[in-house]
Amino acid sequence: MVQSCSAYGCKNRYDKDKPVSFHKFPLTRPSLCKEWEAAVRRKNFKPTKYSSICSEHFTPDCFKRECNNKLLKENAVPTIFLCTEPHDKKEDLLEPQEQLPPPPLPPPVSQVDAAIGLLMPPLQTPVNLSVFCDHNYTVEDTMHQRKRIHQLEQQVEKLRKKLKTAQQRCRRQERQLEKLKEVVHFQKEKDDVSERGYVILPNDYFEIVEVPA
């Protein structure tokens, strides 16, 4: 579904070649969503998860300066509307003295476009990543995921170092075991040689016997 602006009279639709972003109604924040609905000034209009307002209806200070100003601030409310929905016939038939004075006109579209164009240059990203944010927390989620990946990479590196240390310790123990085997083998050979040698008896082991002539 191609995104389009829900503001009355606005013909903007999503086009990757135009520096116009679209922002979903904050349905999860009822109070802020009511402010958006009131700003749109459309009777019997109930936004859905597919409803959005384009960036031309927000003043430049509504955007965050990071990420090429494609994200709205948390409490941003659209205020720039050149067209409003026509009133009922009953209201149109009021006497001239009863009619309210017209509201002040907002700045021309060209001026707003120029301001947005200066503050919001087109975002140069790959085609598969050029879709505008569906909500205001996409970049925050991406940053959190990158931070988590970095933490996992650090943990993997620590485990690799521990594994390397354990392997070195194991090799040292194997060398020590080989040395002990050599010592035991040498001791056995020495014991075998001792068993085949002469036995020296003490001097008092023999008794001198006198034989008569």
From Swiss-Prot:
Result when mutating residue 180 to S: In DYT6; no effect on dimerization
Result for mutant: residue 166 to T: In DYT6; no effect on dimerization
Effect of residue 81 to L: In DYT6; affects DNA-binding
Consequence of changing residue 5 to A: Abolishes DNA- and zinc-binding
Effect of mutating residue 47 to A: Does not affect DNA-binding
UniProt keyword annotation of Lyase present: no
BP GO terms, sorted: DNA-templated transcription; endothelial cell proliferation; negative regulation of transcription by RNA polymerase II; regulation of DNA-templated transcription; regulation of mitotic cell cycle; regulation of transcription by RNA polymerase II
Outcome recorded upon mutating residue 40 to A: Partially affects DNA-binding
Localization: Nucleus, Nucleoplasm; Nucleus, PML body
Subcellular location, principal: nucleus
Phenotypic consequence of residue 4 to A: Does not affect DNA-binding
Phenotype upon changing residue 29 to A: Strongly affects DNA-binding
UniProt-listed PANTHER family: THAP DOMAIN-CONTAINING, THAP DOMAIN-CONTAINING PROTEIN 1
Protein family: Belongs to the THAP1 family.
Subunit structure: Homodimer. Interacts with PAWR. Component of a THAP1/THAP3-HCFC1-OGT complex that contains, either THAP1 or THAP3, HCFC1 and OGT. Interacts with OGT. Interacts (via the HBM) with HCFC1 (via the Kelch-repeat domain); the interaction recruits HCFC1 to the RRM1 promoter.
Protein name: THAP domain-containing protein 1
Native organism: Homo sapiens (Human)
